[in-house]
Each structure stands twice: as structure tokens, then as C-alpha cells.
């Protein structure tokens, strides 16, 4: 009998087992036509879990409920699974972080979110306490992640899977960028995890909440209406001439979308799309054609060049994780594609790998909306390029060209944002 998971779409508690299955090579099928509130109320379902909780895993040995137990079962289905670490102490630390994730992160997120969604009574004082407790928990997690890429060891474990799935509810539903910016290492960790192929296959593209949900107010109960006494009809008056009816107010026309401040800058002689086409279409003599063309086009009054250096290179001990981290950064920069061009280099033949970049932005400074919206910006040191300095100018050319070796070291990867 195959493993069958009963759940609804988008259930972060089901994600735990499904991601563990992807890492473990264990086949888990989803129950067909599952409908929350219907399927989990049937006699057959209630035999597996008398209180009808979701998810449930059907196994050859009987049903398993509670999401962490299900994820553990799936992980244990593969012998010597690295998701459980390689030593007794690693196993203990994995269990430690799974418990922390449930009691500190998930529980406090729920105490903040569920009353706002109408699933529990909303009490302002209780909400303040829940937020304070969640910040305390995220602060502890942030401290741990300041010097660790993963929760335990040097690769993904079940602790990372459970923690990321529990963080997902907060990031996706209630924890806005303004809230999570206090915890930059938690942000980096979360976005790195959800962009791993096995996570992404299950979770899809993850977006952060734009706002905190409004408190759901219950509609007031309708007042009982007393039966009205029959009124005696008054003699009808002669009909008066109708006054001109007041026309209903016209719907307000939708306001035009405010222009991006960068669109209001004085015109530049540099046409960014022309440079991007030149970059993409130059296959030979890159230095003579593309690099020379770039400097011929470059307008220091309309654009600015910036070097960036990752602040936490000591954490870059795994090549694919480092490259995925850079890939996630470029995905989140998509909001400024119209106004920017970038090159990101992963440097070194052995860990820890260095991450450096070059960015061309419209305007004399890094756009404010990029600094506000893309959390990765805080993870880099940014230095404005002085093109009057020939050494800096040559460094720009080398980064655009992916020149190897770069500053005496091999290039592990080079990514272009265009």
C-alpha cells in the first residue's frame, strides 16, 4: 500500500511531509477530491482520527495524525536518512528545533493570526502578548542563524523543513517586511529555504504578506421587530408633481497609478534596453564590442554604478546553497527590472565562497523602493563606483565580462540580471 496523505491544498502542515518525501525519495500520494469540512467529517475519516484533524497519513501499518509525527514517519521510511543527521547529538538538536518551531514559532504566530481571521476571540492585550512572545522567539532564532546556514549541521534536515513550513504561515499571512526586517538572518534563512528545488516543488512561489489582516468583526444580530399595528389609512392627497430626482453620485473614476519617481527623472542619453540587447547579442569580441559599447553609452548623470559585497561570506560553505541564495536575490529584484542591470559573481574554488556584485541603477542613488522592498539589500555592503578611478572602471568591465580569474580567484558562478 502506498502512503496516502489526506489534506487540503496549501496546508503548510502537509508541506512538512511532502518536502521530506522529496528529499527522501519516498512516494506519497494525495487523497483524491479531499474537501475540508466534508471529507474529514466522514465516518471513515473519523475512524482514523476521532476529532477530524487534518492532515492524516494512511500507511500499511495504520493511520498517523499530527503533522510532525507524519513528517517523522516519512523521514524514517528511508533508512539512514541524512534528514535526521549523522550523530546522536545532531538527532537531538533536530528534535530540539522541531519542538522550538512548534511551541515558540507556530504557536505564537497562530495566537496573533487566528483571532484576526475570526477563528478565535480578538483581545488586543492578548495580541500584544503574542507579538512580544513571537519577537522573542524570532530573536533567538535570528541569533542562532547569524552563524549557521542551517539549524543543524551543514545541510537541510527535518528541523529546517518543519521550521520553514511553520515560518511560512507567518511570512505569507501576517508578518510583513516591516516586521521581519528586525530579524535579517531569519529572513535570509527563510527565503533561501523556500527557493530550494525540493521546497519550491511543494510550496510553489512564496510571497510575503503586504499587510496585517484586519480584525474580522462579527455582524450584529438582527433586532427583533415588533409587529406593527395596522394604521388607518388617511385620505389620499392629490399627487404632487415629482421633484426632479437627484442623480446618483457617479462612481469615482479610478485614480491613475502614481508614477515611479525614476520615471520623473530628466531623460538620459543611455537607453537601458539598448545596453541589455548589446550585452545579450554579443557572442564574440565581448571586450571590444560590449564593454566598449557600455562605456560609450554610460551616462553618469542619469545612472549610477554600485559594487556590492555580501556581509556573511563565512556562511557560504555549500556551493549550491550559495548559488541559490544569489538566485533568490535576483528574483526579488524583479520589481526594478525596468530600471536596473546587474552582475552577481560567486567566487572561489573552495568554501567559504565570496559573493560580489555590480549593479547599474537609474538615478544617482540606489532607488528607495528597492532598499525598502528587497530585504537582501541589507545583507550587502554597497559602494558607489567612482568612474574617474581607472582601477574601479576596469573592475566594472571585468565583472560585466565575467573575466576569470577574478581578482586572482576562480569563478564558481556568474549570474546576470537584465
From Swiss-Prot:
Q: Which Pfam families does this entry report, sorted A to Z? A: EF1G, GST_C, GST_N
Q: Indicate yes or no for the key word Protein biosynthesis.
A: yes
In terms of superkingdom, the source organism counts as Eukaryota
What name does this protein carry?
Answer: Elongation factor 1-gamma 1
Query: One GO molecular-function annotation for this sequence?
Result: glutathione transferase activity
Write out the function statement from the record.
Probably plays a role in anchoring the complex to other cellular components.
Residue limits of the GST C-terminal domain?
A: 87-213
List residues of the EF-1-gamma C-terminal domain. 258-418
Q: How does it assemble?
A: EF-1 is composed of four subunits: alpha, beta, delta, and gamma.
- Pinpoint the GST N-terminal domain residues: 1-82
